[in-house]
Amino acid sequence: MAEKFTQHTGLVVPLDAANVDTDAIIPKQFLQKVTRTGFGAHLFNDWRFLDEKGQQPNPEFVLNFPEYQGASILLARENFGCGSSREHAPWALTDYGFKVVIAPSFADIFYGNSFNNQLLPVTLSDAQVDELFALVKANPGIHFEVDLEAQVVKAGDKTYSFKIDDFRRHCMLNGLDSIGLTLQHEDAIAEYEDKQPEFMR
């Protein structure tokens, strides 16, 4: 059972870049592991660090700014998560501590993978995202509230509505990944299997 997502209030970091691909999110040299943990240390590795080993932080990269340490909401530009279909991208984001990504658009595969890993991708219009970037840059350290039940983002004195597919919303609210969804039908599966001929079991 995955962690339930109903509402999250967190520090927002503005990544003012469009077309952020999965290789930028988690470079290919860090993909050897098949478990979901440990990838956060390499999130945006080529941008966060000046050296290949990830030991010299780049002071000009926004995730390294002191005011954004502990951020759990990532504000980004259009086509976030494009490139290859690696599921390691949402793994790296969640392992780092992100719960929500807000952008005007997402690559389709990344969008689906995010829900599978309890990372909420929130789609707002370009104009709304522009407003949020201006708000965050004028108020470093600002927190947003993201309410999945009400499907709204509360930022400053404004509220922004967003849409999520009902099925994906249900899964996030109830902490259901693909295994959890299957286990919801465990009795029906067992009943079906009992009806199968012996040679098919």
From Swiss-Prot:
Reactions performed catalytically: (2R,3S)-3-isopropylmalate = (2S)-2-isopropylmalate
Catalytic EC class: lyase
Claim: Amino-acid biosynthesis is one of the keywords in the record: yes
EC number: 4.2.1.33
A Pfam family recorded for this sequence: Aconitase_C
Keyword set includes Acyltransferase: no
GO molecular function, one term: 3-isopropylmalate dehydratase activity
SUPFAM superfamilies per the UniProt record, alphabetical: LeuD/IlvD-like
Pathway: Amino-acid biosynthesis; L-leucine biosynthesis; L-leucine from 3-methyl-2-oxobutanoate: step 2/4
GO annotation (BP), single: L-leucine biosynthetic process
Keywords recorded for this protein, A-Z: Amino-acid biosynthesis, Branched-chain amino acid biosynthesis, Leucine biosynthesis, Lyase
Domain of life: Bacteria
GO CC annotations on file: 3-isopropylmalate dehydratase complex
Family per similarity comment: Belongs to the LeuD family. LeuD type 1 subfamily.
NCBIfam families: leuD, PRK01641.1
Subunit structure, interactors included: Heterodimer of LeuC and LeuD.
Function field: Catalyzes the isomerization between 2-isopropylmalate and 3-isopropylmalate, via the formation of 2-isopropylmaleate.
The protein's name in its UniProt record: 3-isopropylmalate dehydratase small subunit 1
Lineage of origin: Bacteria, Pseudomonadati, Pseudomonadota, Gammaproteobacteria, Enterobacterales
